[in-house]
């Protein structure tokens, strides 16, 4: 992960940069170690982890984290599959 991709939302606040880095590291941890064990389960395109990375990079840790949480809550067997991109 390069520092330039940690926050594309333009924040220079060091705290936000740290929070973003931690959130992105947790997503990478999930992708590398947990996801291979449980297999593909996401009902959307892009996957929830890819969505989370993009949302945090584009909108910063707070709005990006909120969008990611909302997406995770929508990803269950009773929701129809489909394309759900990160909003602008």
Swiss-Prot record:
Its main location: membrane. SMART domains: Haemolytic. It is found in: Cell inner membrane. InterPro entries: Membr_insert_effic_factor_YidD (IPR002696). It is a peripheral membrane protein. Keywords: Cell inner membrane, Cell membrane, Membrane. One of its GO terms (cellular component) is plasma membrane. Belongs to the UPF0161 family. Could be involved in insertion of integral membrane proteins into the membrane. This is Putative membrane protein insertion efficiency factor.
